[in-house]
Amino acid sequence: MFFFLQLLVPIISVFQSKKHYYSTFIRCSISNRRPEYVPSKISDPKYVRIFDTTLRDGEQSPGATMTTKEKLDVARQLAKLGVDIIEAGFPASSEADFESVKLIAEEIGNNTDENGFVPVICGLSRCNKSDIDKAWEAVKYAKKPRVHTFIATSEIHMKYKLKMSREQVVEKARSMVAYARSLGCEDVEFSPEDAGRSDREFLYDILGEVIKAGATTLNIPDTVGYTVPSEFGQLITDIKANTPGIENVIISTHCQNDLGLSTANTLAGACAGARQLEVTINGIGERAGNASLEEVVMALKCRGEQVLGGLYTGINTQHIVPSSKMVEEYSGLQVQPHKAIVGANAFAHESGIHQDGMLKHKDTYEIISPDDVGLSRSNEAGIVLGKLSGRHALKSKMLELGYDIDGKELEDLFWRFKSVAEKKKKITDDDLIALMSDEVLQPNVYWKLGDVQIMCGSLGLSTATVKLINTDGQEHIACSVGTGPVDAAYKAVDLIVKVPITLLEYSMNAVTEGIDAIASTRVSICSIDRHTIMNGSTGQTIHRTFSGTGADMDVVISSVRAYIGALNKMLSYEKLVSRYSKPEDSVVV
C-alpha cells in the first residue's frame, strides 16, 4: 500500500498542502449534494459520478450468473445506494439479457426518489448497428437512458482481434456513435478498449472524432489492468490536454485489477480530471475483477477534502454493506474476510495494543465508523429474538436489518426462524440474514427439499435418501451411496432431477460461534452439455456457471439446500432462454 501511495503522490500533490496532509484525523463526512444530471457536463467540478457495472462486467465473473429477479433486486439496491449510472447489461448478448435490461429500465429507470433522483440506465454494445439497436431498444424506456459502445484501439487488438486498420477503426467508432445519436439517444458513452496500451496520438484522434459525432462521455479503460497509478493519471492528463473538444464531454475511468491496482488507478484518474468512475460492488468482474465501489467511494469520502481536491460523490454510504451482502449472495462470490470496507474482519481488532487503544478512543485504530457503511457494531442493540417471538417482532427486526418482507415471504421465514429458535438459545443478526438468504432470497423454486436421511460411518460407503417436491407438489424419493454424506445426498438429488450437473466449487462456514452455529454452504455448478457461451473478447468457449447457498444447523441439509438452490437457478435460466431462442443457440458476451 505504501508503494501505491508513493505512486499517487505526484498526481495528488496539486491538491494538498502540508497543513492538510499532516492535519489531525477528521471523521468521514456525508455529503448529500448532487448536481442536476446533464449528460455531457457537471455543474460542480468537484462532483464525481459513480457508474456501477456490477450487472454487466461483474456478472461476467465465473459463477456469477444472476436471474432476472436477482438483477432487478440488485438494481433497486444500487438505486438506494445512489449510483449515478447503472450499466444493466449487454442487451445484444442474449434475449434473456435484453429482457433484464429492459425491465430494469422500465422499473428502476422510472422510480424517482423523494429527492428527485433517478439513476441513468445504460446498456453496453459493440460498434455495430444491430448491437446499438438492441441496447437502445432495451434502455429507451428509462427517464435517463444511455448507450455505451466500444471498440478496441490498441495495436494488438486491432491487428489480431479486429483485423482492421486504424482508419477503419476510427470510421467505425465515429459512424456508430453518430448512429446511436440518430436513434434519439442523447447520452452516448464511448470506450476505446485497451486504451492503456493504445498509441497516444491515435487515441487523441479517435476520441476527437467520436466527440464530433456526439459522444457525451469518454471512458478510458485499463482493460487488462496493466498501468500503474502515476502512468494512468498521466494518461488522463494527456487526453485532457490533447483531445479536441474534450472540454465538452465527461472523462471516465474503467480500471481492471490484474495487478491489484484498480482502486489506486481509479483515484489517480479522478485526481487527473476524470469525473465518472466505473466500479462494481465487491470489485467483482472478469479475471481479477474491477475497481471496488466501496473502496473508491470511501477513499473519496474519507480523504477527499484533505488530499483529493475536495472530490465527492452522491453515494449513500450507509447502503454499502447491504449492497455488498446482496451481491455476495446473488453472485455466489464470497467476500474474503480481509476485504477492505466490507470484509468480515474490516472492523475487527484482535491485537491487545489495538484493543486497548480502541477502548480508550475509537479513532486510534479506526478511520471509518462501521455505521458509515451500514454495519452495526453489535447484535446486542435493538430487538432480541427468541423462541417466543412472534411475526411482528421478526418483521420489525428484519426491517431493522434492511429487509422489508411481508406475506408469504414473512411466513416462510417465520417458520424457519421458529425451527432454529427451538434448538438455539440465541438468534443473532447473522443467523437471521443466513435464514433470509436461504428461505427468501432464492430463485424460482422448481424443486424443494422435503427430507434427508443419512447413514454414514467408517465401516463403508455413506448412504443418503432424499425426498424432493416439485412445483406440482409431487414427492420424489431417491437413494444413493457416495464417498461421504454430502456426496451421497447430491447423487440422490441427481437421480431425481435427471439433469447432468458438474459440481465446481463447494465451501462451508459457520455463521456464528458455538456448537449450535448455523452452517452456511455455497456451491457452484455447471452443465457441461449446455449453456455454452463465447467470450467476445477472447473467442474462448465458456460454460455458464450457477451458484447456490444454503443454511441450516445440520451441515448435510445446509449442503443439499445450496445444491438445490444452484439447480433452481440453472433451471430458471433455462426457462428464460427457452422463451427467446433454441437451447443450442450460443451467446456472445
Curated annotation (Swiss-Prot):
Pathway given in the UniProt record: Amino-acid biosynthesis; L-leucine biosynthesis; L-leucine from 3-methyl-2-oxobutanoate: step 1/4
Top EC class of this enzyme: transferase
UniProt protein name: 2-isopropylmalate synthase A
Gene label: IPMSA
Positions of a divalent metal cation binding: 57, 254, 290
A matching Pfam family: HMGL-like
GO cellular component terms, semicolon-separated: chloroplast
Entry EC no(s): 2.3.3.13
Gene3D superfamilies per record: 1.10.238.260, 3.30.160.270, Aldolase class I
HAMAP family in the record: LeuA_type1
NCBIfam families on file: leuA_bact, PRK00915.1-3
Keyword Ribonucleoprotein: no
Residues of the signal peptide: none
Family from the record: Belongs to the alpha-IPM synthase/homocitrate synthase family. LeuA type 1 subfamily.
Reactions catalysed: 3-methyl-2-oxobutanoate + acetyl-CoA + H2O = (2S)-2-isopropylmalate + CoA + H(+)
Keywords annotated in UniProt: Amino-acid biosynthesis, Branched-chain amino acid biosynthesis, Leucine biosynthesis, Metal-binding, Transferase
Superkingdom of this protein's organism: Eukaryota
Alphabetical list of CDD domains matching this protein: DRE_TIM_IPMS
Cofactor requirement: a divalent metal cation
Role, per record: Catalyzes the condensation of the acetyl group of acetyl-CoA with 3-methyl-2-oxobutanoate (2-oxoisovalerate) to form 3-carboxy-3-hydroxy-4-methylpentanoate (2-isopropylmalate).
Residues of the Pyruvate carboxyltransferase domain: 48-321
Gene Ontology biological process terms, A to Z: L-leucine biosynthetic process
